[in-house]
Every structure is written in structure tokens, then in C-alpha cells.
């Protein structure tokens, strides 16, 4: 009887030790997967950022800014509009102001990294965001949801 109790005790202890070891291994593996996922995501979106930076040097990009300004002018329909651009895009200020009209003001924005424009109607406080930064952020969220890189419990 004593032998049986000892055997049961040792069996339970070994099972507990094994369960603990398995849990530690699963936790370590989950962390490694999370780190790999983050690294892969960073590489993908760093490459996308480089591609966007090259795009902003093209005529297509300046045409896109003009198109955005036209959409904003139409959406804000004669409002008191302030456009926000990154420093590198301030060279387009006069062209964009001419499109939006009505005393449109252009302001440099430090939080626009990749390009595009953001607008605000200074009277109604309505906002429009057509920045490449926001589009990239939305794509990153989509990528994380649909890439199959989710980590299941």
C-alpha cells in the first residue's frame, strides 16, 4: 500500500513537471512566433515604405495630389479649408491652393511621413485624410488580419 501511494505521488509529480515543461515550451514558442511575425511584418512594410518613397518622386504622385485636392474642394464645397502637407510636398502648395480656392491655407505637417494630404474645414472642423500614411496603416491592419500569420491559442 505504501509502495502504491509512493508510485501515485511520483506519477502525479512527474505529470505536473511535464505539464509545466510543456507550458513553458508553448509559451517560449508563442513568443518566438510573435517575434517572427513582427519581424516579417516590419520587413514587408519597410519595403512598402521604400516603394512609396520612390512613388512620391514621380509625376503620378503629383497628379494624385491634384486629384486629392479636387476631391477635397468638392467635398468641402467652398469651405474655409486648411491643407496639411509634408515638408517635401510644400512645392505643390500654390497648385493645390488654386484648386481648393476660397483662401485655402497650406500648413506643413510633421506627422505626414510618406505623403498625400490631409484637409480640415476650419469652420465646421470636418476632416479629410488622403495621406499615404493612413493608407499604409490601413493596409497593415488588413495584412495582419488576412495574412494567415495570426497566432492561435
Predicted feature residues:
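Elongated, mostly alpha-helical coiled-coil "stalk/stator" tethers of large membrane protein machines
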Residues: 32-153
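Long, amphipathic coiled-coil
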Residues: 1-40, 44, 48-55
